[in-house]
Amino acid sequence: MASITDKDHQKVILVGDGAVGSSYAYAMVLQGIAQEIGIVDIFKDKTKGDAIDLSNALPFTSPKKIYSAEYSDAKDADLVVITAGAPQKPGETRLDLVNKNLKILKSIVDPIVDSGFNGIFLVAANPVDILTYATWKLSGFPKNRVVGSGTSLDTARFRQSIAEMVNVDARSVHAYIMGEHGDTEFPVWSHANIGGVTIAEWVKAHPEIKEDKLVKMFEDVRDAAYEIIKLKGATFYGIATALARISKAILNDENAVLPLSVYMDGQYGLNDIYIGTPAVINRNGIQNILEIPLTDHEEESMQKSASQLKKVLTDAFAKNDIETRQ
């Protein structure tokens, strides 16, 4: 992974030019992240068209090379971002997608690894925790160099909801959603705070904020994707911006703490699974995992979420008989 240490030229290969992928590329252009973006998709005309369209925005932002790419172009990339996969339909859970997207994923990871790619995989296709684990198994890469978007979007939704409730800037809210990016995710209320004031203290000072309001707020966060899909067919702006933030942390060697899908090696009593938790990320991938002290209820929620993921993961690999590199 020699090129990622060269701050003057950072190369990203995006696999998947659907709504999420193209929105991600646009976010990268607007924020001036990376100097080269290659876009891979089975629909070549779409990647060519998007490359031209995005390049037209460069005079308003910063110089960048954007082009329709092949898997072989990943050989000297710093980062491969995978958004390709079957989209989530109305009424369909993220876990329902697993069998369809496992097969798609294998057709992506194999040629990327064969190209000589030696950077970092960032996975966003759903179900993200399972597909990130699958990317690790299929690639044979070290676990720190395969990461998923995890609960980054859920956490952003959570912070925004709290911010709207108390009328502050969402960037001043510090709170996390952990676990599966999906139905078994949970809020870490015990460490949530607004500018250092805990949620418990805030509620005590504002009796109009009842517990049932907080419960409803989290449920709306958890189910936000279903509502958006019902209204407009897909979610993409939020996750695309989250992916751009993660990419920036990797490429700029930030050592940023972000809620990501990472490999558990004893943390929270979990092993051999990818799941959402705050972690430190830099140009080498995951530097370390922050094991937040959880309440008994939160710990129970983490175990429940992991158990659900483990079951689906085991069933999916058994059913699809996928050959892996580790």
From Swiss-Prot:
Substrate binds at residues 88, 94, 126-129, 154-157, 235. The modification Phosphotyrosine is found at residue 226. Allosterically activated by fructose 1,6-bisphosphate (FBP) alone under acidic conditions, while it requires additional activation factors such as divalent cations (Mn(2+)) under neutral conditions. Under acidic conditions, Mn(2+) is an inhibitor in the absence of fructose 1,6-bisphosphate (FBP). In case of L.casei, L-LDH binds four fructose 1,6-bisphosphate (FBP) molecules per tetramer, while usual allosteric L-LDH binds only two fructose 1,6-bisphosphate (FBP) molecules per tetramer. Pathway: Fermentation; pyruvate fermentation to lactate; (S)-lactate from pyruvate: step 1/1. Keywords: Allosteric enzyme, Cytoplasm, NAD, Oxidoreductase, Phosphoprotein. Its EC number is 1.1.1.27. NAD(+) binds at residues 20, 41, 46, 71, 85-86, 107, 124-126, 149. The keyword Cytoplasm applies. Thermostable up to 50 degrees Celsius. Thermostabilized in the presence of both fructose 1,6-bisphosphate (FBP) and Mn(2+) ions. It catalyses: (S)-lactate + NAD(+) = pyruvate + NADH + H(+). InterPro entries: L-lactate/malate_DH (IPR001557), L-lactate_DH (IPR011304), L-lactate_DH_AS (IPR018177), Lactate/malate_DH_C (IPR022383), Lactate/malate_DH_N (IPR001236), Lactate_DH/Glyco_Ohase_4_C (IPR015955), NAD(P)-bd_dom_sf (IPR036291). The active site is at residue 181. It holds the Pfam family Ldh_1_C. Beta-D-fructose 1,6-bisphosphate binds at residues 159, 171-174. Changing residue 174 to D: Shows a lower thermoresistance than the wild-type, even in the absence of fructose 1,6-bisphosphate (FBP). Not thermostabilized in the presence of fructose 1,6-bisphosphate (FBP), Mn(2+) or both. One of its GO terms (cellular component) is cytoplasm. It is an enzyme of class 1 (oxidoreductase). The keyword Protease does not apply. GO terms for biological process: glycolytic process; lactate metabolic process. It is found in: Cytoplasm. HAMAP family: Lactate_dehydrog. Homotetramer. Belongs to the LDH/MDH superfamily. LDH family. Catalyzes the conversion of lactate to pyruvate. This is L-lactate dehydrogenase. It comes from Lacticaseibacillus casei. The gene is ldh.
